[in-house]
């Protein structure tokens, strides 16, 4: 039996419930979920800052999550390289991923003979800390209000 392979990608810097929701959703679409974790250098180029957690630690944490079968580091040369190697049946984009829109990604992959289903996750359950940025803001707020003592 051929397994249906699902791939998603992200930074995963400061894991939070939103990450977990995307990963559960992605796993529900197939038999095998492989996650591409962004390299530190790539994050710096896209977000203008290095991630807080180093890439290998982020990869290990993501791979330890129940929905994930395997986590790999992305390519420094070509963002599409891991996708071209993995040949997924489904690609899941997070709600805030803007590097590619669905149509552009389809067109790029078609040039290589790949035609995966591309799905954008839209089902965030709103919770107080569904983004790394919200977590950092709350830590700063509590620290400034002296609710956190170091």
From Swiss-Prot:
GO terms for biological process: FAD biosynthetic process; FMN metabolic process. It holds the Pfam family CTP_transf_like. It is an enzyme of class 2 (transferase). Transmembrane segments: none annotated. Its EC number is 2.7.7.2. One of its GO terms (molecular function) is ATP binding. ATP binds at residues 11-12, 16-19, 96, 124. InterPro entries: Archaeal_FAD_synthase (IPR050385), Cyt_trans-like (IPR004821), FAD_synth_RibL (IPR024902), Rossmann-like_a/b/a_fold (IPR014729). The keyword Flavoprotein applies. Pathway: Cofactor biosynthesis; FAD biosynthesis; FAD from FMN: step 1/1. Keywords: ATP-binding, FAD, Flavoprotein, FMN, Nucleotide-binding, Nucleotidyltransferase, Transferase. Its cofactor is a divalent metal cation. It comes from the Archaea. It catalyses: FMN + ATP + H(+) = FAD + diphosphate. Homodimer. Belongs to the archaeal FAD synthase family. Catalyzes the transfer of the AMP portion of ATP to flavin mononucleotide (FMN) to produce flavin adenine dinucleotide (FAD) coenzyme. This is FAD synthase. It comes from Methanocaldococcus fervens (strain DSM 4213 / JCM 15782 / AG86).
């Amino acid at each position: 039996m051929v397994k249906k392979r699902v791939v998603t990608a992200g930074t995963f810097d400061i894991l939070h419930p939103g990450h977990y929701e995307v990963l559960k959703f992605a796993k529900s679409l197939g038999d095998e979920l492989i996650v591409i974790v962004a390299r530190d250098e790539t994050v710096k180029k896209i977000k203008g800052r290095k991630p807080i957690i180093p890439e290998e630690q982020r990869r290990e944490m993501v791979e330890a999550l129940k929905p994930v079968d395997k986590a790999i580091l992305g390519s420094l040369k070509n963002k599409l390289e891991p996708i071209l190697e993995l040949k997924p049946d489904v690609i899941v984009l997070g709600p805030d991923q803007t590097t590619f829109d669905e149509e552009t990604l389809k067109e790029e992959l078609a040039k290589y003979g790949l035609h995966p289903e591309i799905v954008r996750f839209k089902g965030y359950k709103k919770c107080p800390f569904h983004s790394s940025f919200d977590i950092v803001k709350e830590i700063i707020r509590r620290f400034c209000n002296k609710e956190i003592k170091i």
